[in-house]
Amino acid sequence: MNFKKAGIFRRSSEGSEQPEVQNDSGGMLAVWGSPGSGKTVTAVKIAKMLSAKKKNVILLLCDMTAPMLPCICSPDELECERSLGNILAAARIGENLIKHNLVTLKRSNYLTVLGLLKGENEYSIPPFTEKQAIELLDGLRQIAPYVIVDCGSYIANDILSAVALMEADSVLRLANCDLKSISYFSSQLPLLKDAKWDADKQYKVAAKAVPHPTHRKCVGRYGKRITTTRETAEATAVSLVPIGGD
């Protein structure tokens, strides 16, 4: 899998069509979408899939309203408990600081996680800037070939998620097939209409799609879908680390 903008998913507009060659060079994928669309579950599954293929991957959990690390991985599965807040509190963010605060897992040699700990919130750390967020993302790129960013929905007040959407090689955009999601994107997409925002790097997915005329219209608009099945409905209960490890 390759999330690079110049990789297998990018359409070439120069000259005649050439057969695309897959280049497994990694990249940064931001998973973003409307509230309740399954962003974290999707990000976790992608990270687990890559680690199962023995690819070094970092999963960055941006949500500071409801920190997701305690939700997807129990404390006894962690080799250490370190916080994303320790990094963002630094005036200058370097590679060594990031490595020191990455959370490693007992049963996975290829997957590391970064996020806030249980009980922490955005007021647990000093205010940080766009520059610090960029330094963090650049540092993660240097440490691992694959970086999966689980973005929060409220990007107007979430600097880290907003910067990740700008800096990522590709964005997986999830939307539920309901009016709330339509209202959400009508409100939030104008915030991203900036010179730095590349709409071509988005891959739109209709999440939690079920057989229904309205949902079929939504799926037709987005092109891809995540169908609601028993497996996807139970996905939120799946631990980040499988019992058997990688």
Residue ranges and their predicted role:
Residues 53, 57-112:
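Phosphate-binding loop that captures ATP/GTP phosphates
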Residues 63, 113-119, 229-233:
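Short loop/turn segments at strand-loop or loop-helix junctions that form parts
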Residues 236-246:
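C-terminal boundary of histidine-terminating zinc-finger modules
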